[in-house]
Amino acid sequence: MKERKVIIKTGLNLENSYTSLPEIFFTRQSPSRVPSPKLAVLNYPLITSLGLNAQVLQSADGVDILAGNKIPEEAIPIAQAYAGHQFAHFTMLGDGRALLLGEHITPLGDRFDIQLKGSGKTPYSRGGDGKAALGPMLREYIISEAMNALGIPTTRSLAVVTTGELIMREAELPGAILTRVAASHIRVGTFEYVSRWGTVEELRALADYTLQRHFKKGYDKENPYLFLLQEVIKKQAELIAKWQLVGFVHGVMNTDNMTISGETIDYGPCAFMDVYNPKTVFSSIDIYGRYAYGNQPNIAAWNLARLAETLLPLLNINPNEAIKIAENAVSDFTKLYKNNWLSGMRAKLGIFNEEFQDEYLIEDLLSIMHKYGADYTNTFRALTFDNIEDTVLFDKMEFDKWYKLWQERLTRQEESKLSSKQLMKSSNPSVIPRNHRVEEALEAAVKEGDYSVMEKLLEALSKPYAYSKEQDYYSKLPEPSTCPYQTYCGT
């Protein structure tokens, strides 16, 4: 690997603090060389916020770094080890096709993982080729950047490069590598891994590292490991509520896909709900609906219980006391989630103050939307802009009754109607990454090499709350189909 290390002024300022952990947590590994890397898409706003050099990253040397052909001098590429409950079944996992180059320290002192996804085989590949296809990598780029624009914590996408390879999936597909940026890649599954195969000392090392990286205030607490658990629970309660508020269905909420930082990660089989239905499932492999839209809060609580189990040896020397502490912490999730969700739903309806009956008002609207097959995003958009006549709810008796109750509710607060409208506009996106529009962009890019469709989509998605007539195209529902939209774990 030494001959591949280069000094190129990309602006990357890499450290490798994760390698200070015991070696059970990672394996050093070089990226596979690729024959003909070309830049497909580069995230200029993210480059600016990270303090990187766009001009250099676009150069041949920069593209070689994004492809893994050249390695920044300070980088120590590693594949991270982790386990996970996949559809409730525990299994050993790890980075099977991704490598962490290191942690970039921004000019402001923030720390972000820089990971190459699709960079070749690792010891954790489990028979896979370690490669990634262009379509799924572009899909992750689109969805993750849309999530960021919506104000939802997420990993980010810095770049996608094509590799010049054809990789075998359901057919021969063009290969690609995505550069992912994350607060960290520490997962619930990372803790499960060391809990199952490591020592208590190694578990403590991971917990201490996580406190240092994400929850430094924990060192001042009487029980820092309880603080760690509580903070992760709070972050996940906030995150899942934000998913629900925009109709996002993750699709594969395995414990290895729940981050300790509270960021959304892994955009494989995800999609956004069109017609409101709590049972909405997109993933082709989720045949029993375990990860359906309406079940996501319950799954999050289940995953957090698995995290709590791993921390038992650190929570209290007495096993029974440790279990009580963990159970009390996890039991807080439901209330925390509900408070976040109710607060967000009030905002979507222009409500500033709290009343006990608000939950019934919200649930009644959702029930009516479900009954009549109303589009989730467009219904709230119609309420925001007073054009409900454009929805399927227009002239429905139940909705008329609900609408009057809502208008009456708005009078029981000090804020003006104008203030309510402004709150609704900032809480109800006009545009989301509709599944058919995403597929349209991917087909043009992958099959025709035309990235203009994707660029226009990304431009619309970058300002989801700023309504304009140009966004109407991206707000239209898909044509009725006998085949429901399905997603696959390509990313």
Curated annotation (Swiss-Prot):
ATP binds at residues 94, 96-97, 117, 129-130, 180, 187, 266. Its EC number is 2.7.7.-, 2.7.7.108. Its cofactor is Mg(2+); Mn(2+). It comes from the Bacteria. The keyword Nucleotidyltransferase applies. Keywords: ATP-binding, Magnesium, Manganese, Metal-binding, Nucleotide-binding, Nucleotidyltransferase, Transferase. It catalyses: L-seryl-[protein] + ATP = 3-O-(5'-adenylyl)-L-seryl-[protein] + diphosphate; L-threonyl-[protein] + ATP = 3-O-(5'-adenylyl)-L-threonyl-[protein] + diphosphate; L-tyrosyl-[protein] + ATP = O-(5'-adenylyl)-L-tyrosyl-[protein] + diphosphate; L-histidyl-[protein] + UTP = N(tele)-(5'-uridylyl)-L-histidyl-[protein] + diphosphate. One of its GO terms (molecular function) is AMPylase activity. The active site is at 256 (proton acceptor). Pfam families: SelO. Transmembrane segments: none annotated. Mg(2+) binds at residues 257, 266. Nucleotidyltransferase involved in the post-translational modification of proteins. It can catalyze the addition of adenosine monophosphate (AMP) or uridine monophosphate (UMP) to a protein, resulting in modifications known as AMPylation and UMPylation. Belongs to the SELO family. This is Protein nucleotidyltransferase YdiU. It comes from Clostridium botulinum (strain 657 / Type Ba4).
